[in-house]
């Protein structure tokens, strides 16, 4: 698939978020640009880290490919060096789908879970993707009442999320990394199929070194734990991308 990158990037983005910009290629496809911006606390903390966009595009592409190889349908089409991805155009469902294998982050702030302890089973959590309301947690009734998804779609989304977890947990385990938790977004294509969309990167996952439990994700930036790009590079290296 040949695309004229420079011409596409001259267009006004369809969407420009905290760390990515999305450009239309045609009626069915978009170009996702992974920028070097890094944020935490819903954008309250912000910096620009050279090389982050490249690493996230590279890692996301690899993980989308792994999902596709294991029967999980995604919006991913192709990686374009250095920081771009071609993807199917989808309508994003405004629900953040979070899967947790180990207690960490907000789960420990909100509930009496012990930080770092393995959960008895993967917990699937839905949050309303809405900055104005602070991305509150959803239950099924609220999601349906708000018209975000049907009950059938929510059941399917949970099924997809658990399959994503199964694939990625195994992949990272083989690379000496613990998949603590992650969030994904789900989009609908023209036919109404549910596809894993957005990105899957150290921006959207918690990853710990299996032996040392060193943090290899955006918590390094959130908590000022050191050089976040160096940690992202470790993830890319373990995945055989560098």
Curated annotation (Swiss-Prot):
Pfam families membership: SAICAR_synt
A molecular function (GO) term: ATP binding
Intrachain S-S bonds: none
GO biological process: 'de novo' IMP biosynthetic process; cobalamin biosynthetic process
Source organism of this protein record: Methanocaldococcus jannaschii (strain ATCC 43067 / DSM 2661 / JAL-1 / JCM 10045 / NBRC 100440) (Methanococcus jannaschii)
Enzyme class: ligase
Coiled coil (residue ranges): none
Protein name (Swiss-Prot/TrEMBL): Phosphoribosylaminoimidazole-succinocarboxamide synthase
EC number: 6.3.2.6
Catalytic activity: 5-amino-1-(5-phospho-D-ribosyl)imidazole-4-carboxylate + L-aspartate + ATP = (2S)-2-[5-amino-1-(5-phospho-beta-D-ribosyl)imidazole-4-carboxamido]succinate + ADP + phosphate + 2 H(+)
